[in-house]
A protein has these predicted regions:
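Short amphipathic helix-loop junctions that connect adjacent transmembrane helices
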Residues: 32-45, 238-252
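C-terminal transmembrane bundle of multi-pass solute transporters/carriers
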Residues: 61-64, 72, 78, 92, ...
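Primarily residues marking transmembrane-helix entry/exit sites
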Residues: 9-17, 45, 104, 108, ...
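Substrate-agnostic recognition of the 12-TM MFS/MFS-like secondary transporter fold
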Residues: 14-31, 55-70, 74-89, 106-165, ...
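Juxtamembrane intracellular "pre-TM" segments in multi-pass secondary transporters
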Residues: 1-13, 193-223
Length: 407
């Protein structure tokens, strides 16, 4: 266990870790409340997908700008300002919920603003970790622990949201998120940066694109995350449908379903944090693609809550095993002067593909009148891609090992 949390020995990363963990719990509380309200207000799977699309599409459009800003300016200042914006949105949503004046357009607008802020924040946050981890050998562990905070919040946040929605009310969910940002902002202000806050490079996104295009391991890592995000999109978008229409539950059951997925993700992040080397990481990516795909197909045909929970656990664990492993490899390989922009491409493939999946799957579910085919399609894609990776991964692993030896 000591080996799992070894990066927390450093003061700066320890402060960042705990402040971010508190803030992310609030973020997940708000996310669950938004999805629940969207389905309650509209009663439409298509509108549920559209609200998700409006929050995720900025990741596809604006993330390159976030990556360029991260390479040119103080990463800490970018994070602070984006969190101030997100706190303001959470406060506004709490007031709107208290007045009971939600409409589809308010939900879409709020999601879009949060999406733009996230597009600035996420690549910056990925690159910021290298500034507060001063021993490069600890970088894989720090990245895994960063994923751990996200997934611990993903486990706790929906449970808190379900309890808050059932016992208190919707405004309380947004108020919890607004207050949670205080922890993140405070801890980031107390971090002592030992090197310049920004790389101040004037390079363009084209330089990062050229690096990814020419270097096969980086190209495949970005592609793997993109395909995985498309495959996991139904689990992100349609859980309110399953909670209400399939399992005849309410917001508390939605929290349980999302918590099961978060539990699997948390277990995967803990496993990766306990690894002392990158050995076997390629095989773990392949296995997660195959297992996650099977879980998606099985979930589509399942109508038993007792079976749905372990399937969601497996799906969540597979997803995080893939994207966090790819993150660790990419951050280990990428040159420092390209880090912000390359991680912007990673974020585009990670988060930016979700809106396409949400919109396409939402339209498909609306036309068919069922969400079952959506999960089947996603599962088949994941299994097929896992088979492709079985063919190409050995060569990619050799190229990555050579690059790491010469870094």
């Amino acid at each position: 266990m000591k080996n799992t949390f070894r990066s927390l020995a450093g003061r700066d990363f320890r402060y960042y870790f705990f402040g971010q963990a508190i803030s992310l719990i609030g973020t997940w509380v708000q996310q669950v409340a938004l999805s629940w309200i969207a389905y309650r207000v509209t009663g439409s799977a298509f509108m549920l997908g559209l609200v998700a699309f409006s929050g995720q599409i900025p990741m596809l459009v604006a993330t390159p700008l976030g990556g360029m800003l991260a390479d040119r300016f103080s990463k800490r200042n970018i994070l602070l300002w984006t969190q101030v914006v997100e706190m303001a949105v959470a406060t506004t949503l709490s007031v709107v919920a208290w007045q009971q004046s939600f409409s589809p357009w308010i939900l879409i607008t709020a999601s879009a603003v949060l999406g733009v802020a996230g597009a600035m924040e996420m690549p910056t946050r990925q690159a910021f970790i290298t500034e507060i981890i001063h021993d490069r050998s600890l970088l894989p562990n720090a990245i895994a622990l960063n994923s751990l905070t996200f997934n611990a919040a993903r486990l706790l946040g929906p449970a808190v949201a379900g309890f808050t929605l059932a016992i208190f009310n919707e405004p309380a969910c947004f108020a919890i998120n607004a207050v949670s940002y205080v922890a993140a902002i405070y801890t980031q202000l107390t971090i002592h940066l030992e090197k310049p806050a920004g790389n101040r490079t004037s390079g363009s996104l084209i330089e990062a694109l050229e690096y990814v295009r020419r270097f096969a391991p980086a190209r495949w890592l970005v592609a793997i995350v993109a395909v995985t995000s498309i495959c996991v999109s139904p689990f992100m978008t349609f859980m309110p449908v399953y909670a209400q229409d399939i399992f005849n539950g309410g917001p508390d059951l939605l929290g349980i379903l999302l918590g099961a997925s978060g539990g699997g993700a948390l277990a995967a992040a803990l496993f990766l944090a306990s690894r002392r080397s990158l050995a076997g990481i390629g095989n773990r990516i392949i296995l997660a693609c195959l297992v996650g795909g099977v879980a998606s197909v099985a979930f589509a045909y399942n109508r038993l809550l007792t079976l749905a929970l372990p399937l969601l656990f497996v799906s969540g664990g597979s997803f995080i095993m893939i994207v966090t492993s790819c993150n660790i490899l990419l951050q280990s390989l990428v040159p420092e002067h390209l880090r912000g922009r390359v991680m912007a491409l990673y974020t585009m493939s990670f988060i930016g593909m979700l809106p396409l999946g949400s919109l396409v799957y939402g339209s498909l579910a609306h036309q068919i009148g069922s969400v079952k085919p959506v999960f089947v399609i996603a599962g088949v894609i994941s299994i097929a891609y896992g088979y492709v990776l079985m063919k190409v991964m050995p060569g990619l692993t050799q190229m990555a090992q050579r690059a790491l030896r010469t870094a």
